Regions:
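Serine-esterase "nucleophile elbow" of acetyl-processing enzymes
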Residues: 1-41, 46, 51-60
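Catalytic His-Asp segment of secreted/periplasmic serine-dependent ester chemistry enzymes
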Residues: 14-16, 110-184
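Oxyanion-hole/transition-state-stabilizing segment in secreted/luminal serine hydrolases
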Residues: 17-20, 46-85, 102, 108
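A general structural detector for well-ordered alpha-helical segments in enzyme core domains, enriched
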Residues: 23, 27, 51, 82-89, ...
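Helix C-cap/helix->beta junction micro-motif
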Residues: 31, 96-97, 130-131
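Residue-level recognition of beta-strand->loop/alpha-helix junctions
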Residues: 37-39, 104, 136
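Glycine-rich phosphate-binding loop signature in dinucleotide/nucleotide-binding domains
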Residues: 57-61, 96-97, 177-178
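Active-site segments of SGNH/GDSL-like serine hydrolases
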Residues: 67-68, 89-120
Length: 184
């Protein structure tokens, strides 16, 4: 069993249900690994990075998951700032010998928000795919307009069933990441 410190926004936290209904809780059930939930609703990538840098983590932590970007878009932070925050996060994790996994921002049921999220997902993939684990949970959520409408309570926060599906989908990918790193 390994432990992963998970930093992010409401989608890490499991809003509106809370950490026990988050996708991390489901991944924990499936894998038997421990996923520490450090999600804070409303956080932007700079907030998440700041918490990561200032929080005292258990000494045995070797893996960090990071999910952010949607709140940055909502608050009209430029994509450039988000990418800089992700790069700083990767460099910080490398300096502390943490293995970083970046969770791609989810496509929402809000088309105006997706005009910014879709390009951000592409740029994150282009910039970080060769440098760290990228975890794309979108297949568990869906992509068609009907799937997206059904997946979210309010256009951006998943239903409890979708959080479970995200965790079930993520579990083997996370297990593979942890096993691969463990064999180094």
């Amino acid at each position: 069993m390994q432990t992963v410190a998970c930093f992010g926004d409401s989608l890490i936290y499991g809003f509106p249900f809370g950490p026990r209904t988050s996708w991390l809780a489901e991944a924990e059930k499936v894998t038997g690994d421990k996923f520490l939930n450090y999600g804070v609703c409303g956080d932007c990538t700079d907030d998440i990075l700041s918490r990561l840098k200032t929080m005292t983590l258990p000494a045995h932590i070797k893996h960090i998951l990071f999910l952010g970007g949607a709140n940055d878009i909502i608050q009209m932070r430029p994509q450039k700032f988000i990418l800089e925050d992700l790069d700083k996060t990767l460099r910080y994790c490398q300096s502390k010998n943490f293995d970083l996994g970046i969770v791609l921002p989810l496509v929402t049921a809000e088309s105006r928000l997706n005009e910014y999220i879709l390009p951000l997902r592409d740029v994150i993939s282009a910039c970080f795919a060769e440098r760290t684990l990228l975890l794309d949970l979108q297949p568990a959520v869906g992509l068609t307009a009907a799937e997206l409408k059904d997946a979210y309570l309010d256009g951006v926060h998943p239903t409890a069933a979708v959080y479970r599906a995200m965790g079930t989908y993520a579990a083997p990918l996370l297990r593979n990441w942890l096993e691969k790193d463990n064999s180094k």
